[in-house]
Amino acid sequence: PSQHAPFPLGFRYDYCNTDILTHRLTVSGGLLCTPEGLTYRMLWIPHNQRMLTSTVERIGSLLRQGALVVASAPCSPATLMGGKQGEKAFRQAVERVWGKRHKPGLYRVGKGTLAVGMSIQEALEATRMQPDVQSPDSNLQWLHRRTQDADWYFVAAPPQGTFRGQVRFRCQGIAEEWNPVNGRIWQADVTQADGY
């Protein structure tokens, strides 16, 4: 999807190509992880009618390890290589991952969950996933990164605008505000409620 396409408020996404999917993503504690320490709560594969057999197999592996994947079964392989044998391998891989799971719903696959036939919004609601950031201004710009010791949120006013108000973050602990212009750091005035 386009970076500017409508997306559920309070959530962000990164793009992932087949190389990252195949070689760089692992699953730990139900989260998809990169070697750099980035974590993701969900792998979303929208409207993908064709896939490589290796991609289907990797999705199955991530599911069995505990990932949450939002994807419907692909219809055909993304390559003609392998001829009829390649087609057969593709069909078998799809059967191992999706099997009879074609109706909209949540399905257990190994330790993971497969959300089939759902929009991203429907999958978020079905899994009761809470937004990372809540703000009265839907145009507020933000980015979240987590390290071993802290959650980091970079927050900026909407383009060509200003922001004044409360923002809720899905994390707990002591909060500091850092001014990127002058380097000033101060203790933020925070309250904690409902996981925020």
Predicted regions and their residues:
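Carbohydrate-binding surfaces of carbohydrate-active enzymes
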Residues: 1-196
